[in-house]
Regions:
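Electropositive, glycine- and tryptophan-enriched low-complexity nucleic-acid-binding patches
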Residues: 128-184, 268
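Domain-level cores of phosphate- or acyl-group-handling catalytic modules
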Residues: 165-223
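Active-site-proximal, Lys/Arg-enriched surface segment
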Residues: 73-149
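Short, conserved catalytic/metal-binding motifs centered on acidic residues
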Residues: 45, 59-60, 68, 72, ...
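An anionic, glycine-rich sequence signature occurring as long contiguous blocks
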Residues: 206-300, 304
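Membrane-interface transmembrane-helix boundary segments in multi-pass integral membrane proteins
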Residues: 311-322
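A short, flexible helix-boundary coil/loop motif
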Residues: 1-37, 52, 65, 224, ...
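Short, positively charged, Gly/Tyr-enriched micro-motifs
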Residues: 22-90, 103, 150-153, 187, ...
């Protein structure tokens, strides 16, 4: 599905662009019957828009060897979400297992990515999810992801689109099913309070030990968290009902100690399935291993194109391309550039994700003939104004 450049000699911008094109261009895009274009032409526009963090319209406007933005979007509107998601996840898995040792167990984190959205739905109301106010809106397109942290960088394992009219647990199940197919053992599953859900907890603990941050909601949970001392206990979700779920609850007390201008006591609760041999504070320390997700989002934003289209599948495709580019960078950084040394490879600081994106941008702008001049007006400053200006 892709060929890693030769590790001898040098890795060039041309090499990076070629492998990015090799990875992204085959993504399934039905296209327009009778068109002289092929899917690769359209995906090059998307790649350039992503590494430039700009729109498809602006990308097409500024280059001579790309189709117009209307044609590009007409093609992208033919995307099939399920087929696109399936192939993209195969690629994410291929990248991940290029750099992850299958014989080493891993800590896997799952999370929702909310992409803020202004406007109405495209075809169905279920396309849009609700979120806390952000960027002047409370609606978003939502994606569920799973990742592991390797060499201090998050590697995306799986991603799926989340609809408002489906149970979020169904989306989580799709991601967990993909994670379960990886050849490495899973030591621990970590998730924030958005995954505090009976079905999610039941499914996750079947796969591995599970730690989920608990929201401070409900009188019984608030009573459990009303303490000044860390402790382990048992909690019954949906107590005395057919859906009742018992799980170990870790209640950890810590102190702000002036962090971010705050002080005093803070009490947090965690679902602690499979880690009851740990203290509540140790469970909290396990949960903090998911902190690498902020790095992932920061990198994704460096390669996420902009679009005003309401089509959720096109917006999802742009997010998938960003995730694939991020994983590809991790592969090239480790497999081609990092120098072997005792205890692991020496990861190069100079080959950053920004550099990776800059190289692709440079090569594609040359290939697609980025415009570097504009016709002058032939008039200049009127004589009367030139005289007044001295």
């Amino acid at each position: 599905m892709f060929n890693i450049p030769d590790p001898d000699g040098y890795l060039s911008a041309s090499d990076v662009k070629d492998v990015a094109e090799e990875v992204i261009a085959p993504l399934p895009l039905p296209g327009v019957e009778g068109s002289p274009l092929d899917p690769g032409d359209i995906w090059l526009v998307v790649i350039l828009a992503c590494v430039n963090q700009t729109s498809i319209w602006e990308t097409c406007k500024d280059t001579d060897e790309t189709p117009c933005d209307d044609t590009t979007l007409t093609w992208l509107h033919t995307l099939d979400r399920h087929w696109l998601e399936f192939v993209a996840n195969l690629l994410l898995g291929r990248f991940a297992m290029t750099i992850l040792d299958p014989d080493r167990s891993r800590i896997v984190s799952i999370d929702f990515i909310d992409n803020p959205y202004h406007g109405d739905h495209y075809a169905e109301e279920g396309e849009l999810c609700s979120m806390a106010p952000k960027d002047g809106t409370t609606t978003c397109h939502r994606y569920c992801t799973a990742y592991v942290v390797s060499n201090e960088k998050p590697v995306t394992l799986a991603m799926t689109y989340v609809r408002n009219d489906e149970d979020e647990a169904d989306a989580v199940e799709r991601v967990l099913a993909r994670v379960e197919n990886y050849p490495f053992e899973i030591d621990l599953l970590l998730a924030d309070s958005g995954f505090y859900n009976e079905r999610v907890i039941r499914r996750a603990r079947e796969i591995a030990a599970t730690v989920v941050h608990v929201p401070k909601k409900g009188e019984r949970m608030k009573d459990k968290l009303d303490t000044h001392k860390s402790y382990m206990t048992t909690y019954r979700m949906y107590k005395d009902s057919e859906r009742e779920l018992r799980f170990p609850l870790a209640v950890a007390v810590s102190y702000h100690a002036g962090d971010r201008g705050k002080s005093g006591e803070v009490v947090r609760g965690y679902v602690a399935c499979g880690v009851t041999d740990r203290s509540a504070k140790q469970v909290e320390r396990l949960y903090r291993k998911r902190s690498g997700i902020e790095t992932s989002y920061r990198l994704l934003r460096q390669a996420r194109g902009i679009t005003t289209t309401r089509d959720p599948v096109v917006r999802f495709a742009i997010m998938l391309v960003a995730a694939l580019l991020e994983n590809l960078w991790l592969v090239l950084r480790w497999a081609v550039v990092a120098r072997p040394r005792r205890g692991g490879r020496d990861l190069p600081e100079e080959f950053t994700f920004k550099t990776f994106c800059d190289w692709i941008r440079h090569e594609l702008e040359e290939q697609l003939r980025r415009q570097w001049k504009i016709k002058a007006n032939g008039v200049g400053v009127p004589a009367s104004q030139a005289a007044a200006a001295g």
